[in-house]
């Protein structure tokens, strides 16, 4: 059995980095799997439910903004990936990771695949779970801080996000290790 692993949320200035691990059922295929960035929001949300219903096993995990600031975004991403793999109810024989690096600490044979979210269904499914879950987090953060527009820009460094920071400052969930946030706090970069 093969598990696909992918992440969402490395680039934003706020919130957690989210990883998902998925083992698909070869006898219960899911149509339309692709890199989450190539799908509409509506299609991702539909597949989010279908993946959870049809996969043999799936797990979503995260590393929060504090862990990102303590470890750095790469190591926090690897932490979230390890947590996602550890959270699977079935242990896979192999783990396919989207990207060019393998997280340390996964005891199962891993293979890094650049562009794997577009070429391997297991990674595509993980990409969708991670992206939709993180987008849901941003919608909740938007309810908590409606002046920031998190539901729209998802925490990415957009003009609207920078304007909100300039007017309202940063929120607790901002990643203080990121240069734009440090500048807003007048911390040396």
Swiss-Prot record:
Keyword Acyltransferase: no
Annotated positions binding a divalent metal cation: 6-7, 98
BP GO terms, sorted: DNA replication, removal of RNA primer; mismatch repair
Location (main, coarse): cytoplasm
Enzymatic reactions: Endonucleolytic cleavage to 5'-phosphomonoester
Pfam families tied to this protein: RNase_HII
GO cellular component term, pick one: cytoplasm
One of the record's GO molecular function terms: RNA-DNA hybrid ribonuclease activity
Residue ranges of domain RNase H type-2 in the record: 1-189
InterPro entries, A to Z: RNase_HII, RNase_HII/HIII, RNase_HII/HIII_dom, RNaseH-like_sf, RNaseH_sf
EC number(s) per entry: 3.1.26.4
Subcellular location(s) per record: Cytoplasm
Cofactor: Mn(2+); Mg(2+)
Coiled-coil residue windows: none
Class of the enzyme per the UniProt entry, highest EC level: hydrolase
Keywords tagged on the record: Cytoplasm, Endonuclease, Hydrolase, Manganese, Metal-binding, Nuclease
Cofactor details (free text): Manganese or magnesium. Binds 1 divalent metal ion per monomer in the absence of substrate. May bind a second metal ion after substrate binding.
HAMAP family: RNase_HII_B
Free-text function comment from the UniProt entry: Endonuclease that specifically degrades the RNA of RNA-DNA hybrids.
Family: Belongs to the RNase HII family.
Protein name: Ribonuclease HII
Annotated organism of origin: Acinetobacter baylyi (strain ATCC 33305 / BD413 / ADP1)
Lineage: Bacteria, Pseudomonadati, Pseudomonadota, Gammaproteobacteria, Moraxellales
């Amino acid at each position: 059995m093969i598990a696909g692993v992918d992440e969402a949320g490395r680039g934003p200035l706020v919130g957690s980095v989210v990883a998902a691990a998925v083992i698909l059922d070869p006898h219960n295929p899911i149509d339309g799997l692709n890199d989450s960035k190539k799908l509409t929001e509506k299609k991702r949300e539909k597949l989010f439910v279908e993946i959870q219903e049809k996969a043999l096993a799936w797990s979503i995990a995260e590393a929060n903004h504090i862990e990102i600031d303590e470890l750095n975004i790469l190591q926090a991403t690897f932490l979230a990936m390890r947590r996602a793999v550890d959270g699977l109810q079935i242990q896979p024989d192999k783990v396919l990771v989207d990207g060019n690096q393998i997280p340390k600490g996964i005891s199962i044979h891993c293979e890094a695949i650049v562009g794997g979210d577009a070429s391997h269904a297991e990674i595509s499914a993980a990409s969708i779970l991670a992206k939709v879950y993180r987008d849901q987090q941003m919608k909740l953060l938007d309810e908590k801080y409606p002046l920031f527009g998190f539901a729209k820009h998802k925490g990415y460094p957009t003009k609207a996000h920078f304007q909100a920071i300039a007017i309202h400052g940063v929120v607790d969930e901002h990643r203080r290790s990121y240069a734009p946030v440090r500048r807003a706090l007048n911390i040396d970069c």
